[in-house]
Amino acid sequence: MSRRGTAEEKTAKSDPIYRNRLVNMLINRILKHGKKSLAYQILYRAMKKIQQKTETNPLSVLRQAIRRVTPDIAVKARRASGSTHPVPIEIGSTQGRALAIRWLLGASRKRPGRNMAFKLSSELVDATKGRGGAIRKREETHRMAEANRAFAHFR
């Protein structure tokens, strides 16, 4: 029996402008080499570009993009009877949101374009419309899970 106390679950802080935890999670994933002010700059410029492109609330666009990209199921490698099988596993909301943010940023970094703010805004707008690299990644993950449904009993 462990003598350690249970770790307190940390809640994500909200950012200063939008007062939203989701925005802060995104900023922390954009962050590179400890340059948080640059991460704030990138995201706020992207939000401004979204406002100009769609003429709607950029926060709702961000929420919708993340909701569209969030996977329901993923594939995890499990070792059973001497061989490794890809086993489909359901994903919780927190982990799904984290994956969605990671995929959105990965897809926007791969995009051709001028700067990160422009690429991120384009990716978020595309994700709300059901296209883009992050949506492709989600569909690919769901396809993999569907193809390996036979191994679902290995959970």
Curated annotation (Swiss-Prot):
GO terms for biological process: translation. GO terms for molecular function: rRNA binding; structural constituent of ribosome. It comes from the Eukaryota. It is found in: Plastid, Chloroplast. PROSITE patterns: RIBOSOMAL_S7. Pfam families: Ribosomal_S7. One of its GO terms (cellular component) is small ribosomal subunit. Keywords: Chloroplast, Plastid, Ribonucleoprotein, Ribosomal protein, RNA-binding, rRNA-binding. CDD domains: uS7_Chloroplast. One of the primary rRNA binding proteins, it binds directly to 16S rRNA where it nucleates assembly of the head domain of the 30S subunit. HAMAP family: Ribosomal_uS7_B. Part of the 30S ribosomal subunit. NCBIfam families: rpsG_bact. Belongs to the universal ribosomal protein uS7 family. This is Small ribosomal subunit protein uS7cz/uS7cy. The lineage of its organism: Eukaryota, Viridiplantae, Streptophyta, Embryophyta, Tracheophyta.
